[in-house]
Amino acid sequence: MFRIELTRGSSWQEPVETIDHRDCETNSIDAAVAEAKYWLVQTQKNAPARGVTHYRVVSENGTAIGGPP
């Protein structure tokens, strides 16, 4: 299972704020990243006032990957 976070800031590694988050119940990092990218684009399109700039996918052990760069 992974946690997907939508963040605001200059980079996904050091977000200024976590805007929203949700759990992604999959064992596939590729599936979690695909869901995160889709959620990011949809949020930017449908709720631009939220100021979302990046996504992060965090594993149960705390390892994070994200984007866009």
Describe the function of each predicted region.
Residues 41-69:
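Short, mixed-charge low-complexity intrinsically disordered segments
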Residues 1-21:
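Short aromatic-glycine-(Arg/Gly/Cys) micro-motifs in beta-strand/loop hairpins
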